[in-house]
């Protein structure tokens, strides 16, 4: 069931990025969509690319729902998990890039790339999608495909 859901999410994300937009929205929805995209973009840039876990409360609700089973639900669970992850040493050339952000009202999807050189000397790349639901200017929910 989970693999089926992940396959559906990946398919939906691929279509959204191939088209370049999720949906046509009314002008009021465009403003909401742009604000929500900015929240997610700023969160991703500040907290995940910038590795600044202490900034997470500016972006995540206390009751943040995390659908990735490797990260506990709630702001505290997110912060505890990412403090541990960010304490781990990364390859010197590790890079995380935000490639695209699309949204429709309260739903925002990002497309990102991670690159690094492994201990084997080989260059590695990982591409991923993350989907967020924004509520009242704060990230309320997160899904990802791996």
PLM segments and residue spans:
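A solvent-exposed, acidic/Ser-Thr-rich amphipathic alpha-helical stretch
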Residues: 53-104
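Hydrophobic/aromatic beta-strand elements that line small-molecule binding cavities or substrate pockets
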Residues: 82, 96-101, 113-114, 127-132
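Short beta-strand edge/turn micro-motifs at domain boundaries
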Residues: 127-146
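Short, cysteine-centered beta-strand-loop-beta hairpins and adjacent loop/turn segments enriched
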Residues: 88-91, 116-124
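Bacterial N-terminal signal peptides
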Residues: 11-21
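Short, low-complexity N-terminal intrinsically disordered segments enriched in polar/charged residues
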Residues: 20-58, 62
């Amino acid at each position: 069931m989970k693999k089926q859901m992940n396959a559906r999410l990946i398919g939906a994300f691929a279509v959204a990025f191939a088209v370049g937009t999720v949906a046509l929205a009314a002008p009021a929805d465009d403003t909401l969509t742009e604000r929500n995209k900015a929240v997610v973009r700023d969160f991703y840039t500040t907290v995940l690319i910038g590795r600044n876990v202490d900034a997470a409360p500016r972006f995540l609700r206390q009751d943040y729902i995390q659908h990735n089973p490797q990260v506990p639900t709630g702001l505290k669970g997110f912060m505890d998990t990412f403090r541990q992850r960010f304490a781990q040493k990364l390859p010197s050339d590790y890079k995380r890039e935000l490639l695209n952000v699309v949204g429709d009202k309260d739903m925002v999807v990002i497309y990102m790339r991670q690159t690094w050189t492994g201990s084997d000397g080989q260059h590695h790349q990982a591409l991923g999608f993350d989907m967020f639901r924004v509520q009242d200017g704060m990230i309320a929910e997160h899904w990802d495909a791996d």
